[in-house]
């Protein structure tokens, strides 16, 4: 039996199955392997207190607020006014109703390489709803539906390092003062909540922080999908994703109580998160607010506040790109929002190496090429062993064909004769496939690094404007309802795969031989949908592999065509 070819066919078949599974999820169907995909992204709540939804009276009405709509709790109608704060990185619109962040524009990130529009995370313009809200709960206290007064002050950072916005609201003798602090070159917004008890009795309010978002996902390729939805992190349970679908079905399983942690709303390349600064007990919740409207939040008790006393609770709101250089400074475990898949332990060192290479070369395209060469050098001995085995197999292919013909219909005798041939020619039938199998985790990890890294987004290289998008050199077309971009890299990929096929031993089975000839075309079509950075890696890797394999094959004396 040709074990190597069997293993390669298993890998190829599994790859096609995974692509079909991705297509099912892309079209809204259940996963072949996991059924409801959301179930695999949840952690069962087994610890004490994790199975109960926190009891709170956080206002559930969210989304765009008409100017004349009555405020819950018997307040008079509020007149909404938008206060805009501009820094070097963001432009934030904050509503005087609730002190709610209604719009957050990222000034350093465009929607696409061909667009002059900036990425907008928080937004309240239909059909998008994505908001950051905080307030008090536990009584008739100011919340994200209350009208706030704004203190005078500058709204432009200019040449300074910080800009502050101070807002206050009072209800039933309880005053809430919110202070937003924006800092230069930072996507973190510090939010200080000062609670003043102007009543004649003690109060025990809690501060809630929640992110509200519609359930819409960003446009993606059918060949790869990334997580969009809420997440909860605690030191005990680590990073827990919660899908919109699980919230819809009431099956949102995550930790409900902890003394630390944070909540986030994650999407491809970007994230928003509330991080309470104090380590004290808090509740975590996810819930459906309305049709296609969901929230993830935390409720942090402030403790008893005596009459005339003031207590404070500080928090940080991060809303920006998942740039690795910034994530570690936000909170413990915050780097986990950058999804490297199930081989994170390998992916992180790969990206670390890429960052250092990029610091020298200054371009992500050349960085990918340099990294490919580096990985190829690391695996050079394994690859050489694989190619030597394949070259020897190619030399004995005529003898193997004779054995198959001689013992046709007698598999036991045929296998015995094959093993005798391997022994005589000193060929290890697994010698060609084992080095390939060892390298597969590295290839998968690099795939996720290139897919998840916002650093590659809108990064140019030669004719390519965006390494995170497909190569569009020859234009874009719609074929059978699919948006297809035609570029030179997938074509080069097909050519390199065709050359590799010619260097490998020809399968004795005519059907297998024809399928092997079609594989370059099949894979090149797939790679038309893949990010240019990923295709660039495969093209360079194939060129290096062809050079190494050709040299070894020629040295051993096997035919090279």
Give, region by region, the residue ranges found by the protein language model:
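Membrane-interface amphipathic helices and adjacent TM-edge segments
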Residues: 22, 308, 378-443, 497-527, ...
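Transmembrane helix interruption/hinge and helix-loop junction motifs
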Residues: 362-364, 525-535
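Membrane-protein biogenesis/insertion across secretory and organellar systems
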Residues: 1-377, 559-561
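Core hydrophobic alpha-helical membrane-spanning segments
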Residues: 9-20, 443-446, 491-495, 518-522
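Conserved catalytic motifs of ABC-family nucleotide-binding domains
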Residues: 447-494
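Hydrophobic core segments of alpha-helical transmembrane domains in multi-pass membrane proteins
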Residues: 490, 533-542
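Juxtamembrane "helix exit" motif at the C-terminal ends of alpha-helical transmembrane segments
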Residues: 144, 358, 441-460, 466, ...
């Amino acid at each position: 039996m040709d074990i190597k070819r069997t293993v390669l066919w298993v890998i190829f078949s599994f790859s096609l199955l995974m692509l079909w599974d991705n297509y099912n999820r892309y079209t809204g169907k259940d996963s072949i392997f996991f059924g409801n995909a959301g179930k695999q992204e949840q952690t069962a709540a087994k610890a004490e207190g994790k199975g109960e939804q926190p009891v709170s009276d956080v206002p559930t009405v969210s989304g765009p607020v008409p100017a004349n709509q009555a405020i819950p709790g018997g307040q008079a109608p509020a007149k909404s006014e938008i206060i805009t704060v501009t820094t070097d990185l963001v432009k934030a619109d904050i509503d005087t109703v609730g002190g709610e962040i209604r719009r957050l524009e990222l000034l350093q990130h465009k929607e696409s390489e061909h667009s002059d529009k900036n990425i907008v995370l928080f937004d309240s313009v239909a059909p998008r709803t994505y908001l950051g809200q905080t307030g008090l709960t536990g009584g008739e206290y100011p919340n994200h539906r209350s009208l706030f007064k704004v203190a005078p002050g500058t709204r432009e950072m200019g040449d300074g390092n910080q800009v502050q916005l101070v807002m206050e609201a009072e209800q039933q003798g309880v005053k809430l003062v919110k202070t937003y602090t924006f800092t230069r070159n930072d996507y973190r917004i510090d939010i200080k909540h000062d609670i003043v008890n102007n009543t004649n009795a003690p109060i025990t309010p809690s501060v809630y922080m929640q992110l509200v978002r519609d359930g819409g996902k960003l446009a993606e390729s059918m060949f790869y999908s990334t997580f969009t939805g809420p997440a909860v992190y605690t030191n005990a349970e680590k990073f827990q994703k919660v899908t919109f679908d699980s919230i819809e079905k009431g099956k949102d399983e995550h930790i409900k109580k902890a003394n630390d942690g944070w909540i986030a709303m994650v999407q491809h390349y970007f994230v928003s998160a509330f991080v309470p600064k104090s380590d004290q007990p808090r509740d975590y919740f996810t819930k459906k607010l309305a049709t296609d409207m969901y929230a993830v939040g935390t409720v942090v008790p402030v403790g008893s506040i005596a009459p005339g006393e003031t207590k404070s609770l500080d928090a940080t709101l991060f809303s920006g790109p998942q740039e690795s250089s910034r994530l570690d400074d936000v909170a413990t475990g915050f780097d986990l929002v950058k999804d490297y898949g199930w081989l994170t332990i390998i992916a992180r060192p790969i990206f670390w190496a890429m960052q250092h290479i990029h610091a020298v070369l200054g371009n992500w395209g050349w960085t990918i090429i340099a990294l490919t060469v580096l990985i190829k050098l690391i695996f050079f001995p394994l690859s050489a062993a694989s190619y030597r085995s394949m070259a020897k197999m190619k030399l004995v292919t005529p003898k193997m064909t004779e054995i198959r013909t001689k013992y046709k219909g007698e598999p036991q005798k045929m296998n015995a004769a094959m093993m005798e041939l391997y022994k005589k020619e000193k060929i290890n039938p697994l010698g060609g496939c084992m080095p390939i199998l060892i390298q597969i985790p590295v290839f998968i990890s690099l795939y996720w690094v290139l897919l998840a890294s916002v650093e590659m987004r809108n990064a140019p290289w030669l004719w390519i404007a965006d390494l995170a998008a497909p190569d569009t050199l020859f234009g874009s077309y719609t074929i059978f309802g699919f948006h297809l971009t035609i570029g030179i890299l997938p074509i080069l990929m097909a050519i390199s795969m065709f050359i590799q096929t010619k260097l490998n031993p020809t399968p004795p089975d005519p059907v297998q031989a024809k399928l092997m000839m079609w594989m370059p075309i099949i894979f090149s079509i797939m790679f038309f949908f893949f990010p240019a950075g990923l295709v660039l890696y495969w093209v360079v890797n194939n060129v290096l592999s062809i050079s190494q394999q050709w040299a070894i094959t020629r040295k051993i004396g096997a035919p090279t065509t």
